[in-house]
Amino acid sequence: MSKKVERKGSFKSISGDELKDFYSSSNNEKNYNIDPGSFPYTRGIHKNMYRGKLWTMRQFSGFSTPEKTNERYKYLLKNGQTGLSVAYDMPTLMGYDPDHELSSGEVGVCGVNVASLQDMEILFDGIDLEKISVSQTINGPAIILFAFYVALAKKNGIDVSKLRGTLQNDALKEYMAQKEWIFPPEPSVKLVVDIIEYCSENMPLYNPVSISGYHIREAGSTAAQELAFTLNNGFAYIEECLERGLKIDDFAHRLSFFFNAHMDFFEEIAKYRAARRIWANRLKDKYGAKNESSLKLKFHTQTAGCSLTAQQPENNIVRTAFEAMSAVLGGTNSLHTNSLDETLALPSEKAAKIALRTQQILAFETGVPNVADPLGGSWYIEELTDKLEKHAIRYFEEIQEMGGTVQAIEDGYFQKKIAESASIYQESVDSKERIIVGVNDFVEEDEELDIEILKISRDAQDTQEDKIKTLRKSRDEKTLQEKMKKLSDACKKDLNLVPFLIEVAEQGGTVGEIVEVMKKVYGEWEESFGI
């Protein structure tokens, strides 16, 4: 038989696995006959999936001042968005007030600036928080922004037990990938558990943490590493909650996840399926979860920002559409589709609408949501799912051998693995082994940018600085300092900080002021290794 001629020397997934030229029946077919909605939920957590309820269309948005972002939220809701997702700016993410010297030039640039309860009120003015679920992407100072949100609900007479939404609040991935930590790993994990504990007792409909693989993938990991490191972080939080004395079925059903949808279409679908299966089996076998809801992994997906290109930016609409489809075929519970201009600026109003319309076309025109897990039983998809599960389990074992997650962070294990994978990927692009249209092939040498770019006015910095100065003059400073002292004492006594932070928020305490009080007890952290 003559040798087949193929267009490349080898075919690999983005994770680096060699791909066969075709896939046929497997010895593991017993796993493939399980229906959607049945343990271990490989095929989806609901029997009828999107036939019953479509995924939540939750576009990540925030820029400039709370007033400007509030206008954008109302625009998105008017155009059919079904949930809100807050993007904070760098000063807020790092725990600085807008008038801090390190905030200069950064206020409102990559998200909305929120420094106080007053800002939170403006951000959600005219939005019914009992009806709209709100996701907040905040980590280092997550417990502070959470306290602002709860204080706002109470001020508006809302029963907090009715609040729906998600707080990202995933400290561990900050040290691995996002690099926006404030405190050392151990106290940061303690703060995560504080919020989980508070929500389990007071806010049963709220997801207190969104364990995030998205940033791990954006930093350069493979799909297998994203899967493994993310689930491993989830297990680490479970261990801390159990040590606190919480019962597994009192909180596990509110743990949520956040994954990336990259360009390797079938590998991404398999990744989501493997995540559900691993989670269900581990929660049942290791942690003894009995509540069916605890076994069902729920996740949000965002299309891959790192796959977008500044060159020929209109092509990003197509990339995003394929990535969104992989997320839906993989059973995501909510979805953000990136805008075509995000390599160049925060999304313009037009670009944000196109991104939302991409989801709506997928939901209402393609027929994709009409059948649960339509790719289930595909020999290719099932073998990919099995392979990713095996990769993940191998990583779990390595991390355990190193002494657990925090020790592996301090030793630089995750950071080095991600850096190695990022380097391999970039080499494949540089060598043209992997083609990126418009970047290393099909290039337009004389390309001119002709899309609208959103520009953030310097007025955002001035406005936020003026607001915080006015706040400091108008608040009851004596009462605030009394509440700050109680907060400091609670830090030292290892108490749950949420009630103390709500009191500080109500008295006009700012993000930066609160962080400084907490730093004096918890300290700060610096990486002590090189990559």
Give names to the regions the model predicted.
Residues 2-28, 35, 39-42, 90, ...:
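Flexible, glycine-rich loop/tail regions that form catalytic "lids" or insertion modules at the edges
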Residues 36, 64-71, 114-118, 140-147, ...:
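Conserved active-site and cofactor/substrate-binding residues in soluble primary-metabolism enzymes
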Residues 95-96, 172, 345-347, 418, ...:
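Short Asp/Glu-rich motifs
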Residues 160-162, 191, 346, 528-531:
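Catalytic or ion-translocation cores adjacent to nucleophile or general acid/base/metal-coordination motifs
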